[in-house]
Curated annotation (Swiss-Prot):
This is Small ribosomal subunit protein uS10. Keywords: Ribonucleoprotein, Ribosomal protein. InterPro entries: Ribosomal_uS10 (IPR001848), Ribosomal_uS10_dom (IPR027486), Ribosomal_uS10_dom_sf (IPR036838). The keyword Cytoplasm does not apply. Gene3D superfamilies: Ribosomal protein S10 domain. The gene is rpsJ.
């Protein structure tokens, strides 16, 4: 029975996201576990169009966008030292982390 830990990271700033992935990878490699990644996932671009003026000039509009960058890390056959190392990693405030435990047969 082989277990996997999948770590998905999301951030609006790609530099803080890359720094967080480096910290997680170095923490896992210190425990001599097998890690795959970081795998860059497709970024999501949200675009918003608003009127510049509240009442008139309908043709005058302004466009904004926000980009969500994502990375995936997969740890094969983790041991308790890996879980302990992951709990001690301190990440930036703008990085969202989702951890999934997958047990395979």
């Amino acid at each position: 029975m082989k277990n996997k830990i999948k770590i998905r990271l999301k951030s609006f700033d790609h530099r803080s996201l890359d720094q967080a992935t480096k910290e997680i990878v170095s923490a896992v490699k210190r425990t001599f576990a097998n890690i795959n990644g970081p795998i860059p996932l497709p970024k999501k671009i949200g675009r918003f169009t608003v009127n510049r003026s509240p009442h008139v000039h309908k043709k005058s509009r302004e466009q904004f966008e926000i980009r969500t960058h994502k990375r995936l890390l997969v740890i094969d056959d983790p041991n308790p030292a890996v879980v302990d190392a992951l709990s001690k990693v301190d990440l930036a405030a703008g990085v969202d982390v989702v951890i999934e435990l997958e047990s395979g047969e």
